[in-house]
Amino acid sequence: MSSNLSIDERWKVIEAYFKSKGLVRQHLDSYNDFVRNKLQEIIDEQGEIPTEIPGLKVRLGKIRIGKPRVRESDRGEREISPMEARLRNLTYAAPLWLTMIPVENNIEAEPEEVYIGDLPIMLKSAIDPISQYTLDKLIEIGEDPKDPGGYFIVNGSERVIVTQEDLAPNRVLVDTGKTGSNITHTAKIISSTAGYRVPVTIERLKDGTFHVSFPAVPGKIPFVILMRALGILTDRDIVYAVSLDPEIQNELFPSLEQASSIANVDDALDFIGSRVAIGQKRENRIEKAQQIIDKYFLPHLGTSADDRRKKAYYLAYAISKVIELYLGRREPDDKDHYANKRLRLAGDLFASLFRVAFKAFVKDLTYQLEKSKVRGRKLALKALVRPDIVTERIRHALATGNWVGGRTGVSQLLDRTNWLSMLSHLRRVISSLARGQPNFEARDLHGTQWGRMCPFETPEGPNSGLVKNLALMAQIAVGINEKIVEKTLYEMGVVPVEEVIRRVTEGGEDQNEYLKWSKVILNGRLVGYYRDGEELAKKIRERRRKGEISDEVNVGHIVTDFINEVHVNCDSGRVRRPLIIVSNGNPLVTREDIEKLDSGSITFDDLVRQGKIEYLDAEEEENAYVALEPSDLTPEHTHLEIWSPAILGITASIIPYPEHNQSPRNTYQSAMAKQALGLYAANYQLRTDTRAHLLHYPQRPLVQTRALDIIGYTNRPAGNNAILAVISFTGYNMEDSIIMNRSSVERGMYRSTFFRLYSTEEVKYPGGQEDKIVMPEPGVRGYKGKEYYRLLEDNGVVSPEVEVKGGDVLIGKVSPPRFLQEFKELSPEQAKRDTSIVTRHGEMGIVDLVLITETAEGNKLVKVRVRDLRIPSIGDKFASRHGQKGVIGMLIPQVDMPYTVKGVVPDVILNPHALPSRMTLGQIMEGIAGKYAALSGNIVDATPFYKTPIEQLQNEILKYGYLPDATEVTYDGRTGQKIKSRIYFGVVYYQKLHHMVADKIHARARGPVQILTRQPTEGRAREGGLRFGEMERDCLIGFGTAMLLKDRLLDNSDRTTIYVCDQCGYIGWYDKNKNKYVCPIHGDKSNLFPVTVSYAFKLLIQELMSMIISPRLILEDRVGLSGGKGNE
């Protein structure tokens, strides 16, 4: 049997993978795990609600999640669909019901199911009803049938929880100390458990002593004292706990000497307690120290007194790692290695958020219970519970992105520019590192990111390398309970640490024998020793492939001259990727398997269960020897890549021939693909997005990669196939600008529509006042003038298909006054103010949709969508799929464009200078492939590494009568003369990006000014001016153009006239009664003269006065135009 699986056969495996997994599986899996397991665990952690009242407590039972629904203002409840939530600005959430059992004097009352709050639902997750709907049913409720879900709807807007990248918690990471400090080597452990994280630091000082520090105790605690406090007393026990190796044991002498005065547990605890409970009695100090050690020292190992020995052995293991580093037996741990990274997904983040919300809820309920019991009422739990505590906590965090633990930007608005940008946003990974610091290593592409993170897709600028995207096949472990794995390990013959130490110290066995044994480390914790590490790793893998151990478990065996460790991992957040298992140089996935996959009789998961494909994390991949191609296989290989191009992420996968481009060009294209206009959602006509673009005639690319079908790009494309000529023509395509065929544009090429939403609701205010959506009366404050309201109907709302321009009122609205005193003074009509919604300045369009509905509070909500036709014009931005971006420099009619012998006229003309220095060979190849596709009617495969060879395509176009280099004899359309050299003509996919001149064009003559400085406002949205800055001013000073300088900086900015007293130099004020200016000091006894200054200068003087500095303006005689006395 030939073991060489063809490209097509391996592609079937990929298709099966995505059929069963989809593209946003990682969020859905994580959220489902939260809903099914973590939610109940958080409730069980609390267990019961204790109260101050003797004999009364409330026991907590099972939690149940209802169907998504809304509570209407008339208190009725009904189920809602996601689309209704979007349109009515609701939150798509389901009620949580918790069983509570009041217990009085150990007598249980009837269990009650109590509503405790709302939980936002992730679309398409296990608890979302629409995940079970058929395609027709989805279309019926207004959803895009291909929408992947994975996001939330909060207050009508779609929000994503972005995956967070973190250093792996509960691992010992060793490093060398800073040069020049007293510390030579350090170990850091982020001990993370339900609800809180405690960093523990171990330091080796120059004198050879070891110190431990953690936040709850000020200062550093000597290592031996801490070990004694944890219950390991004798020097011998401490030394053997650290290591069985005499060389390592010797390094502990300085530490043992340092702590020789403290010999028992109580003294050690008192040493710690004297830092925490200063000046208290010895018993209190010891008790406090015990509490702190249990709760705040390595809490992930447990928080009871029974866990102290476990903590001692963990600490000893960390010390042994530091000593090994000091002795040169191991390298410092690589913080950027992906084995030391964990991703926190929606489920983990939601769990930490819900935990905090639930704690607040319990605290409030305890208070309410005590308050009601004191009054001696019968317990009515339903009346005492305040569900809005949980609801609001969670909703606020999702709506703002401010999470517990001080993280910001955790939830973001889903980017719906096009289909690709939405998918890419759902697969984004953010590193929590500060982007202000350089962090060069953290930004670099690390070898362990192969197949896990996309090598191209990262932003330019300060976030470069910190914001990443998952590769196509990356999958994130949900994690399983480590107790199960620990039990299995002991069954397989792993000897626990304590047992080994007992055998050596008391049983008299040879410690050198155990030094040859392998350390077994489970999730970063030393659990025991095993005779042969290689054998153990092999056994675990065999069991996993047989399905006896969960496939979430990964194992790596690390062997160097000094180190022999087996690392077993089963925690959540590890990025893993599937590989085909190879034995004796043959892949275990056979042709028969692939035929079964193709026919649908087995799924991808079945292959994993059968042990033919397995998921490896970065740690286990260190042991794997992976072949890229079946033809590379040798008997030494352990695994085979399923599909090499799957190392790319979603956006980089759509680039044709990416391996022929310079690397940064692919990065630029990955960013621009998210800005291209296309069909962003099939239900766009029902949606009310704040801003949306729609390309009228998107086409699927003629030159495709295989990933396009998986991503769904062929059904929701964003671009057109354009005929491209490469020629320096007219000079209007210099410096990356392009020339476009005006006739093609007039036929509809790259036309798009821009939708903008305007919305408002009738808000009710305290005191019985409310907004009204009506046509405002001419008497109200801020009335704009009759012509602005001309489009409104009787109900105060514009009607559909009406043309509007900047300043026109779309929704008329009046609001009560802001302050009460106005209300008393003015007539009822004047008291109201006009708060109408107007079309943005500088925009125009046609009213597309008017939606009148009401919010959950029962307030009237009006949404108006305005559409604007956008025809490509000079200055609009376009880009090919190879990072070649440019703006239109000129639109030339077809008659003036160059044409070939066959009469073909290009749609786009690109300057040849854009190609050599950028080295985007992919674009030249795409042009040839596109030409073949257009001639033959076949779509060309340009998948990286597995493409149709370009030479083959060149031979093909030769058969159609074209030159293999795709050049053609061309004539100048203006003169009809033949152009001397042959011109390259090809078909290239061009994208229209959302940077359009219509959104950016801006000029101003007169306009609004700022209240404070009376200078023109800034920015296009506020009709602002263009700033004449300091450097521009310097130029004018250099030119000596005094009048121009005065014109820009005074006359056309904030010129104002002030009146200055000729005696004291203060600015006077205008007395209305006397009808003249008076000096604040001399009254009307002095003369005041007008002086022209900048208002900003006047403001500066008055602000100085407020700081008790007294600037005075000294006046001299004004120079007459005919010349003064000669001494001015």
Swiss-Prot record:
Belongs to the RNA polymerase beta chain family. Its main location: cytoplasm. PANTHER family: DNA-DIRECTED RNA POLYMERASE I SUBUNIT 2. Part of the 13-subunit RNA polymerase complex. Keywords: Cytoplasm, DNA-binding, DNA-directed RNA polymerase, Metal-binding, Nucleotidyltransferase, Transcription, Transferase, Zinc. GO terms for molecular function: DNA binding; DNA-directed RNA polymerase activity; ribonucleoside binding; zinc ion binding. Pfam families: RNA_pol_Rpb2_1 (PF04563), RNA_pol_Rpb2_2 (PF04561), RNA_pol_Rpb2_3 (PF04565), RNA_pol_Rpb2_4 (PF04566), RNA_pol_Rpb2_5 (PF04567), RNA_pol_Rpb2_6 (PF00562), RNA_pol_Rpb2_7 (PF04560). It comes from Saccharolobus shibatae (strain ATCC 51178 / DSM 5389 / JCM 8931 / NBRC 15437 / B12) (Sulfolobus shibatae). InterPro entries: DNA-dir_RNA_pol_su2, DNA-dir_RNAP_su2_dom, DNA-dir_RNAP_su2_hyb_sf, RNA_pol_bsu_CS, RNA_pol_bsu_protrusion, RNA_pol_Rpb2_2, RNA_pol_Rpb2_2_sf, RNA_pol_Rpb2_3. Its cofactor is Zn(2+). It catalyses: RNA(n) + a ribonucleoside 5'-triphosphate = RNA(n+1) + diphosphate. Binds at least 1 Zn(2+) ion per subunit. The lineage of its organism: Archaea, Thermoproteota, Thermoprotei, Sulfolobales, Sulfolobaceae. DsDNA binds at residues 178, 181-182, 206, 435-439, 1027-1032. GO terms for biological process: DNA-templated transcription. The keyword Membrane does not apply. This is DNA-directed RNA polymerase subunit Rpo2. Its EC number is 2.7.7.6. Zn(2+) binds at C1061, C1064, C1079, H1082. One of its GO terms (cellular component) is cytoplasm. DNA-dependent RNA polymerase (RNAP) catalyzes the transcription of DNA into RNA using the four ribonucleoside triphosphates as substrates. This subunit is involved in DNA promoter recognition. It is found in: Cytoplasm.
